[in-house]
């Protein structure tokens, strides 16, 4: 669940958390556990950037590393928002952890090349821990599964490491975003996909991560397990009678089983596996295709983790 800064602070120092209150209330009534992403700059959900316009006089310059010394006013506002959110919701028993940023130090998709510095993110983590020292801090990062993505991610974050590396340094719980198959581009009726789940050469980073967690006694979760299509458009297509190649229903089960197998092979465990794409399952069901919801129900009924 996300605390979207520009939706809550619509005017300077004027906070309206009504929508988030409603979501937390609903989850709590249903007996669910919540990882609340406090942002503040980056939160999941397109466009993954939710800074209020009144805190950003001009767009962040492309290619820069956003640092405390260069954006002091923005950082002060961000820390104030984070503290306000944690103070407001730390009394909610349903909240089990706070997530700081979303893929914190990686570039913002393909749209923007600026990045947050590790020092910036550390100040946000410190603010969360100061406001609530009782709950763990989660930080997530994208796990590359194809050679082109792995090389691009390494190149763009080579100065301070990617979000998984920074999460290992700063977080209590490291979250893995796992999307093994996604579209690269589409021309007419033809789509080019990157598919790397079975390529041995791309497994080293994952093995290192699980080995590190086991040796250091650290906690791992899958914060985003691909459970909806990732096509060459923003909104996943919903074609009647067909499944998109990037994630048909059976792929959800394969993704889950693969991640559980990784943990088992490393003599480790995953604290949680979060399926990413529930809105899509409901959209498919409303279109007469219940296979996505059926796949989730099968996993929940058969898995020892459920």
Residue ranges: model-predicted function:
Residues 1, 34-38, 96-100, 137-139, ...:
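Hydrophobic faces of well-ordered beta-strands that scaffold small-molecule active sites
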Residues 1-60, 110-140, 188-215:
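Aromatic-lined substrate-binding rim segments of carbohydrate-active enzymes
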Residues 2-4, 39-43, 100-103, 142-148, ...:
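Active-site beta-loop-alpha junctions enriched in small/polar residues
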Residues 11-19, 69-77, 112-120, 155, ...:
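Alpha-helix N-cap and loop-to-helix initiation/capping positions
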Residues 27, 85, 98, 128, ...:
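Conserved, mostly hydrophobic/aromatic
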Residues 41-46, 63-114, 270-275:
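Active-site groove signature of glycoside hydrolases
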Residues 115-119, 123-126, 130-141, 145-235:
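Glycoside hydrolase catalytic-domain groove-lining segments
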Residues 217-306:
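Substrate-binding cleft of secreted/luminal carbohydrate-active enzymes
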């Amino acid at each position: 669940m996300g605390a979207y800064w520009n939706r809550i602070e619509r005017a300077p120092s004027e906070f309206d958390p009504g929508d988030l209150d409603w979501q937390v209330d609903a989850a709590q009534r249903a007996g669910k556990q919540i990882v609340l992403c406090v942002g503040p700059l980056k939160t999941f959900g397109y466009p993954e950037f939710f800074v209020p316009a009144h805190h950003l006089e001009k767009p962040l310059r492309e290619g820069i590393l956003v640092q405390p010394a260069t954006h002091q006013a923005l950082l002060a506002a961000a820390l104030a928002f984070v503290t306000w959110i944690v103070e407001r919701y730390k009394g909610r028993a349903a909240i089990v952890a706070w997530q700081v940023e979303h893929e914190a130090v990686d570039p913002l998709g393909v749209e923007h090349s600026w990045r947050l510095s590790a020092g910036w993110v550390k100040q946000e983590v410190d603010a969360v821990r100061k406001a609530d020292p009782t709950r763990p801090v989660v930080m997530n990062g994208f796990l590359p599964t194809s050679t082109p993505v792995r090389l691009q991610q390494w190149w763009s974050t080579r100065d301070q490491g990617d979000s998984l590396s920074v999460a290992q340094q700063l977080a209590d719980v490291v979250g893995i975003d796992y999307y093994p198959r996604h579209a690269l581009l589409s021309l007419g009726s033809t789509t080019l996909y990157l598919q790397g789940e079975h390529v041995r050469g791309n497994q080293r980073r994952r093995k290192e991560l699980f080995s590190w967690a086991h040796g250091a006694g650290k906690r791992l979760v899958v914060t985003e397990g691909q459970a909806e299509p990732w096509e060459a458009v923003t909104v996943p297509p919903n074609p009647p009678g067909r499944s998109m190649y990037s994630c048909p229903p059976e792929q959800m089960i394969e993704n889950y089983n693969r991640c559980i197998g990784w943990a088992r092979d490393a003599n480790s465990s995953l604290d949680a596996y979060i399926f990413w794409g529930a809105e899509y399952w409901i959209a498919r069901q409303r279109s007469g295709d219940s296979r996505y919801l059926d796949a989730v129900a099968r996993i929940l009924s058969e898995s020892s983790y459920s």
